[in-house]
Amino acid sequence: MRDMEELCPSALLMNYVNPMAANSIGMGMASKIPFVGLCHGVQTTLDLIAGYVGEKKEDIDFVAAGINHMAWFLKLEKDGADLYPKFREIFERPEYFINDKVRGETMRHFGYFMTESSGHLSEYLPYFRKNQKALDLYCDQPGFGGASGAYYYFCDMLARKYQEVDYLSFEKGDLTPRSKEYCSNVIEAMETDKIFRFNGNVINKGYIANLPDGCCVEVPMFADKYGLHPESVGKLPQQLAMLNQMDVSVQLLAAEAALKGDPELLFAAVAADPLTSAVLTLKEIRDMVAEMLEDQRQWLPQYEGKSLRTLDIIPTPAGLEGVAVPLDPALAIVHRFGKLADN
């Protein structure tokens, strides 16, 4: 982005790099370069939904909005008829539910389907990976269906397979048909004024009213020769905003920690993570972050010379008497109950 500020300050940066939301927030904090984050979650999930309900995706009128990897299909209609009742009924059938357990269970409890695979979604919420029972119930499918470390092992395998490849000579010169990714369509729209509608990731400026301004949201928008035009969707259903906000807090903290090189903010970001906090104590989280920071320091120059504070467990052996202090109001009530019980 620094190079773009010098060489092409009005050009659009299209980002595909994860973590999409945290990266986007960081870009918004660090630079004035216009950017959009592009993902394939909405369009590929629409294909999936169309198959489930037996409709052509071109015939489905939909609105999707939220945050990257956790946007919600707020509307699913065909010719004005709501497709959600049929879709929800389908996911009550075991032969369908087994294909997408985490997304299906989330929809069953909160009412809406979201845009990321079950394996990915299980990483963003505190409900599905917190213990072995939950893993066996919801994350028992191979690969991205829930297997631990699936994304890492897949990327590592590809990196090893192609580490000696010259990519410029590896790819054929012939143009292949367009994929489901948005990038070339956005470029075409901006160069030819052929309007293209899609979902993109941008800094929230009231586009989703019940998520904080300054976070990264994934909302409907269109591109034309004048640029990008994000659309406001109003308020998400409150339960969906609650689920999004769990990870928005992590993303805001992570971006600020990265830009400032602040180990304590880094710890706070990890401590705020819903899955981490579901399985670890604060002391365990602090020790883990300290270890990870040391192991990855060579790639994190902004943390040079900085370390996380060490906080040991304060011992409170059996029989230890606390000092005399004014009673906390809640403890005072308990104390009063005790007196009443003794009388």
Give the positions of each predicted feature.
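A structural signal for short, well-ordered beta-strand segments and their strand-loop junctions
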Residues: 13-17, 37-39, 198-199
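An acidic- and aromatic-residue-enriched active-site/binding cleft used to recognize and process polar
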Residues: 18-21, 40-41, 65-67
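Short acidic, glycine/serine/threonine-rich loops at helix termini
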Residues: 25-29, 48-49, 74-76
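Rossmann-fold NAD(P)-binding glycine/threonine-rich loop
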Residues: 1-31
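Acidic, His- and aromatic-enriched active-site or binding-groove loops in soluble protein domains
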Residues: 33-53
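A glycine- and small-aliphatic-rich helix-loop capping segment at beta-alpha/alpha-beta transitions
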Residues: 29-35, 80-81
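Generic structural signal for well-ordered alpha-helical scaffold segments
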Residues: 1-5, 50, 187
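Long, compositionally biased stretches enriched for glycine and/or charged residues
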Residues: 51-340
